[in-house]
Regions:
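Bacterial Sec-dependent N-terminal signal peptides
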Residues: 2-5, 15-46
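A short loop-to-beta-strand structural motif that recurs across blades of beta-propeller domains
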Residues: 60-62, 107-109, 152-154, 201-204
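Post-signal peptide N-terminal segment of secreted/secretory-pathway proteins
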Residues: 63-132
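Beta-rich, blade/repeat-based domains predominating
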Residues: 83-94, 127-139, 170-180, 186-188, ...
Length: 219
């Protein structure tokens, strides 16, 4: 079971530290009114993403406020009155939003970091309705890019929160980053390794110019 932590200094996001841990968290006494309280936006906060158990639909997002020393273990559920989904795999902040990649549920949960409220649950589904199984997210110039195990990268507009374009890459991509106006996607081939194809030891490079990514390369 994996947890990802994001440490935020104030609403201006002047510093962010991400790390992974597997230590248990103890529940703290809940104080009414702290959830989504906009008066806390000037304090430091810690967000903890727990992917939960595979196929158990028990992913969670916890929040710790350093200002009042309060922990809400399942912060997302407390605010939105529903669970986060099955196997939350990645979390990142861009602008005023938290983006959570929920792998088995095949969704991208977009959350207002000031209030914890869900702004949109983006369904990552293929045309035939099958799950794309999103894995990781990166950002560039008001766009979010999500790589999925079905061998695709989706471009999401961070204002409308709609999927604008989908591009094919290698087998089971399992990492994505931005550098020098390019997207780099590591392809794993991990899901069909036993079929005799072996690993996919390639990196896809996408040159993204308006209106959509193009010129896919492998190396």
């Amino acid at each position: 079971m994996k947890r990802k932590l994001i440490y935020i200094f104030s609403c201006w996001l002047s510093s962010i530290i991400l790390f992974v841990a597997c230590d248990d968290m103890e529940d703290k006494p809940f104080t009414s009114g702290i959830i989504g309280d906009p008066t806390e936006t000037g304090t430091a906060e810690l967000y903890v993403l727990c992917e939960g158990l595979f196929n158990q639909n028990n992913s969670s997002l916890a929040r710790f406020s350093f200002g009042n020393q309060q922990m809400v273990r399942d912060y997302f559920k407390a605010v939105n009155r529903r669970g986060l989904g099955d196997t939350a795999n990645d979390m990142a902040i861009y602008g005023s939003k938290i983006y959570v990649i929920v792998n088995i549920s095949s969704t991208v949960e977009v959350i207002d970091f000031r209030t914890g409220s869900s702004l949109k649950q983006i369904q990552m589904l293929a045309e035939n309705g099958s799950s794309r199984q999103p894995r990781y997210i990166a950002f560039h110039k008001e766009k979010a890019y999500v790589c999925s195990y079905d061998g695709t990268v989706a471009r999401i507009d961070t204002t409308s929160l709609s999927i604008e374009a989908i591009t094919s890459v290698g087998r089971n991509p399992d990492g994505i980053c931005v550098q020098n106006e390019k997207l780099y996607i590591s392809n794993s081939g991990g899901l069909d390794y036993s079929s005799g194809l072996g690993v996919d030891n390639t990196v896809s490079c996408l040159l993204y110019t308006s209106p959509s990514p193009r010129d896919r390369q492998k190396s």
